[in-house]
Amino acid sequence: MTNMMGAGPFITIPLLMSAMAGPQAMLGWIVALVIVVCDGMVWSELGAAMPGSGGSFHYLRQAFGPERFGRLMGFLFVWQFILSGPLEIASGYIGFANYAGYIWKGIARSDVVILITIVGLINIALLYRRIESIATITISLWAGTLLTVLGVIAAGAMNFNPRIAFDFPPGAFDFSLGFFLGLGAATRVGIYDYLGYYDVCYIGDEVKDPGRVIPRSIVISTAAVALIYMAINLAIVGTIPWREFVPASAHPESNFIVSTMMERLYGPRVATIFTLLILWTAFGSVFALLLGYSRIPFAAAESGYFFKTFGRLHPTRRFPYVSLIVIGAISIVAGFFSLGTVIDALIVTRILVQFMGQVIGVMLLRRRAPDMLRPYRMWLYPVPALVALLGWIFVFATTDIRVILFGIGVLAMGGVAFLLWSRSTQRWPFALVPR
């Protein structure tokens, strides 16, 4: 749940409202919840049945065949993750820079680029060593996030105005093509806010009684975050009229909407304190993400399923420095784009291989390995899996065509890279593999 509660709730509300130009955009957030709950059942079945570390990398290999198409799917997962992981980190950098704009009055675009670069380099430098435990980091991150969240919710509850919160524009629910395109955009923002609901699956071998704990962890964390995010959404839109920060691109103050809210209610001094808390939360979040994400390409390379370069350890400090530098550098560059573009690219890049791939994978395993031990079996199978699949297709299809082409292009390049790598190592499909 900690990874689900970084800077997300403080930076996405203007984007969410801008997607459909009004509070009806919260419908997209509900659609995202339905998709995530159904997809969470997919993760739960896979995680409970195969509770080793690796998550998607492990599940995709087993579902599609570890020495054949599973190698391709595992490779493509890591390939897209080298981009989608940094995109997620970059969203935190962007959020950090946006809220810094409340304190740094008149911050220019060039200043934002410099600030993101400095924060990104500091993040890499702090992680350029062996770190045995992130318990202290996680606790401090969670404490800062919880304090800020509770403060925002309490302030919103005491000043909530339903007329402001539910001020729907004319034709808010006309169900036109534009309505569904906007719904798709709002859903992508909602899914971004939920990202991390599956993180327990990446440490499955460290979980006691995974068949019981993993499904419960996914359900409880998703439900808790849904309630918290809904409360934050209502706290803000019930205090500040949405027309004052929609569209987000035309209202610079939308970059630090929580700071604006606190300033109106309690003055600039309290707003500055909350801004500093959000900056702390944002940095703690990107620190934890870069630490965890830099280990995924390393683990894949070490097990022989990705380029060996990413499996290199620092000669004296014994940490995956190549993977850290690559993920860290891409994160900085990705931070130069707009938050909306970064979120769209992040979600679309993960959909095809990771999310849709796993839905298909759980169905393949049901057919190919009916006797596999499944401590948790998806309720009402295959309905949740099909709902998740249709949801991912909807989110993908309603994305800007340029982002779709970008996502497909990334996977196409990954396919070419896989073939070149397999040819150089004489592995499948260039070497016969026993069935």
Task: Show which residues each predicted segment covers.
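TM-loop-TM module centered on a large, flexible mid-protein loop between adjacent transmembrane helices
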Residues: 13, 58-66, 101-106, 217, ...
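Membrane-interface loop-to-helix entry segments
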Residues: 97, 111-162, 177, 195, ...
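Helix-loop-helix junctions that connect adjacent transmembrane segments
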Residues: 26, 107-111, 139-275
